[in-house]
């Protein structure tokens, strides 16, 4: 935990953060956190607008963009954190051990959140969001330290092509031919072989949406973030040319993703190569737009609202996972039976006024605001909780 260096005490200005920070990155990360909380905590999971749900299998909704946005921004953050230290190889050992420690902490937090809801070690889910972020962060840090950008570009291409070949041309050891069917593809088989069904996502049972094999292409998402971060961090380049280059990268990535989708479908659970390109392109465009508005044109008056989340992203994530459980431990009588605290709020406050879908989303918005106010206390005190 550390105090942020302050240039002003006014919370309406992003000058409270260190000047070396990319303000648009804090904003964009915070916006992603807000979106994540919104889609993860509907008032009623049975009444949700389609864009606020994950795709059933192939395809990509706005909700499917949240996770790759996080990994993409991990890549950008790696550049901003390590670019000045990378040249001195004596620093590498310390950086690697620090990255390893962070990976282990993230894995520990992810497992602890699961045990908070379901204290059953016999069915402890090993894969998870924070677990993947930790592993991808560590491996991407190693790649960034030990390679140049040209090598990383080639590695990204190798990852995307090799993953396509593995899933589409290697037979599944249990006897199935190469396929992309949820329960029968190679990635699902690997998860069952490594974790067993007792330690995977209990709602899918035979495969895990954050599985082991699909972590390989997830590294590609972070490498895209490193590529964009290197361009943003580079000094001495006209910012208009820099933004134009990034927009071109973003559009090209989206187009390549859509072309690849024709033979390797965009799929979040498999984290297909087309999904890496498509989601990475959208994130590139979004971050570039934020960079141009906030860091170039200096329209920063209201950016702090989302930076509250962005600066303390891990804290916001953990709270958004734990607080609903605490609220739902409270059972409230309703129409002859008891309902959870979150569901009660939805039924009593919003459902009598709005349609079920609107009541569900308004309930989620209130929860976003609740978590925001908790994190705002840290922001106000200039406290950043780091791992």
Q: What is the predicted function of each stretch?
A:
Residues 2-387:
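Alpha-helical transmembrane segments and their immediate juxtamembrane cytosolic regions
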């Amino acid at each position: 935990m550390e105090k942020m260096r302050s240039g002003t005490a006014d919370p309406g200005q992003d000058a409270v953060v260190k000047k070396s920070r990319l303000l648009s990155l804090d904003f964009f990360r915070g916006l992603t956190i807000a979106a994540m909380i919104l889609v993860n905590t509907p008032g009623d999971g049975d009444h949700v607008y389609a864009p606020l749900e994950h795709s059933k299998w192939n395809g990509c909704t706005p909700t499917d963009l949240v996770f790759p946005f996080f990994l993409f921004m991990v890549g950008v953050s790696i550049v901003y954190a390590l670019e000045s230290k990378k040249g001195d190889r004596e620093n590498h050992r310390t950086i690697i051990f620090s990255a390893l420690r962070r990976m282990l902490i993230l894995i520990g937090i992810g497992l602890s959140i699961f045990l908070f809801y379901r204290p059953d070690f016999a069915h402890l889910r090993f894969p998870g969001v924070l677990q993947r972020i930790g592993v991808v962060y560590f491996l991407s840090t190693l790649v960034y330290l030990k390679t140049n950008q040209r090598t990383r570009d080639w590695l990204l291409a190798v990852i995307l092509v090799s993953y396509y070949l593995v899933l589409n041309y290697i037979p599944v050891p249990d006897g199935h031919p190469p396929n992309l069917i949820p329960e029968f593809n190679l990635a699902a088989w690997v998860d069952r072989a490594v974790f067993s069904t007792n330690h995977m996502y209990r709602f899918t049972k035979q495969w895990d949406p954050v599985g082991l094999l699909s972590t390989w292409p997830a590294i590609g998402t972070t490498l895209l973030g490193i590529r964009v971060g290197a361009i943003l961090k580079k000094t001495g380049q006209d910012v208009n040319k820099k933004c134009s280059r990034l927009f071109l990268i973003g559009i090209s990535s989206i187009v390549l993703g859509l072309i690849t989708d024709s033979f390797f479908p965009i799929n979040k659970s498999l984290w297909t190569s087309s999904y890496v390109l498509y989601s990475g392109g959208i994130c590139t465009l979004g971050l570039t737009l934020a960079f141009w508005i906030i860091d170039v044109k200096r329209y920063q008056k209201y950016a702090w609202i989302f930076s509250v989340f962005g600066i303390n992203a891990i804290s916001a994530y953990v709270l958004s996972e734990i607080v609903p459980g605490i609220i739902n431990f409270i059972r409230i009588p309703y129409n002859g039976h008891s309902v959870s605290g979150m569901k009660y709020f939805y039924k009593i406050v919003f459902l009598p006024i709005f349609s079920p879908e609107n009541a569900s989303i308004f309930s989620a918005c209130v929860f976003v605001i609740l978590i925001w106010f908790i994190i705002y206390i840290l922001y106000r005190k200039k406290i950043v909780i780091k791992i």
